[in-house]
From Swiss-Prot:
Subunit structure as annotated in this protein's UniProt entry: Component of the TFIID basal transcription factor complex, composed of TATA-box-binding protein tbp, and a number of TBP-associated factors (TAFs).
Primary subcellular site in the record, as a coarse category: nucleus
Protein name: Transcription initiation factor TFIID subunit 8
Domain annotation Histone-fold: ranges: 25-92
Organism the protein comes from: Xenopus tropicalis
Stretches with biased composition (Basic residues): 283-293
Top-rank lineage group of the source organism: Eukaryota
Pfam families in UniProt: Bromo_TP (PF07524), TAF8_C (PF10406)
BP-aspect Gene Ontology terms: cell differentiation
Length: 293
């Protein structure tokens, strides 16, 4: 019979809540059995906790040292010689272990009950579970069912509500206006409502145009380019006409009249094509003088 432990306070956790608490309870059972063999009938909880902590630290140090010796010899799993070397390094008499194991007053601690894994009904199982590879120990939990790896992409449904669309459009318009006003306030001249702090409530300064209709009268770049092209074409036509008149001086008078009429028609067509809609930019036309008969 194990000695009764006088607890100072009730524990708030249970073995089912914490995995490490169950291992801690097993160490407490071992400490209680050692106290019973030593002749103690009862023990304080603080004393049992201290002895349990010492036993846990001792076992952890044995495992850590055995693991380091194992890895030092290029192995992955510790063996009995590794544990023996660890106990010798920690100052433990290894030769006294057989006599201590065969003592007559030792107490046998029963193994904890083994809980079997719940059997999954065949109706709920989908597919065949994946087996563990060679590098994963067998005591690790199994892989989940294959259907857990199936993923279905989700798409966000488009908003079709009229009120929501109007609110969204209004908020976007408001954001654009605010961004534009901030940009204009940073890049252009502003006026402030407060003389001390010019950065608070900046107002965009308006610049009225002195002559509002001046922009409509100024020619654009395209119109200027067209005027230059028409001037150059008229000069080319004049040079061609002079050359033709010099070469055709010895021809008949009828041919001269026909050529002059053709040139006049071409010049009339060119003049009609180069008409400008703006009345202020049209070239001046001289009135034709009628000859007196």
């Amino acid at each position: 019979m194990f000695p009764t432990i006088r607890s100072c306070a009730r524990g708030t956790s249970t073995p089912a809540d914490n995995y490490m608490l169950a291992r801690r309870r097993t160490l407490q059972v071992v400490v209680s059995s050692l106290l019973t063999e030593a002749g103690f009938e009862s023990a304080e909880k603080a004393a049992v906790e201290s002895l349990t902590e010492m036993l846990q630290s001792y076992l952890s140090e044995i495992g850590r040292s055995a693991k380091s010796y194992c890895e030092h010899t290029a192995r992955t799993q510790p063996t009995l010689p590794d544990i023996v070397v660890t106990l010798i390094e920690m100052g433990f008499n290894v030769e006294s272990l057989p006599a201590y194991a065969k003592r007559s007053q030792r107490m046998v601690i029963t193994a904890p009950p083994v809980t079997n894994n719940p059997v999954v009904p065949k109706a709920l199982s989908a597919g065949q579970n994946k087996q563990h590879p060679a590098h994963i120990p067998s005591h690790f939990p199994e892989f989940p069912d294959p259907h857990t790896y199936i993923k279905t992409p989700t798409y966000r449904e488009p908003v079709c509500d009229y009120q929501v669309l109007r609110e969204k459009a209004a908020s976007q318009r408001r954001d654009v206006e605010r961004a534009l006003t901030r940009f204009m306030a940073k890049t252009g001249e502003t006026q402030s409502l407060f003389k001390d702090d010019t950065s608070t409530f900046p107002l965009i300064a308006a610049r009225p145009l002195s002559i509002p209709y001046l922009n409509a009268l100024l020619p654009s770049e395209l119109e200027l380019q067209q005027v230059e092209e028409t001037d150059s074409s008229e000069q080319d036509d004049q040079t061609d006409a002079e050359n033709l008149s010099m070469h055709l001086q010895g021809d008949e008078v009828g041919m001269e009249k026909e050529n002059s009429s053709v040139l006049q028609q071409n010049s009339m067509k060119g003049g009609e094509e180069t008409l400008i809609d703006n009345p202020y930019l049209r070239p001046v036309k001289k009135p034709k003088l009628r000859r007196k008969k």
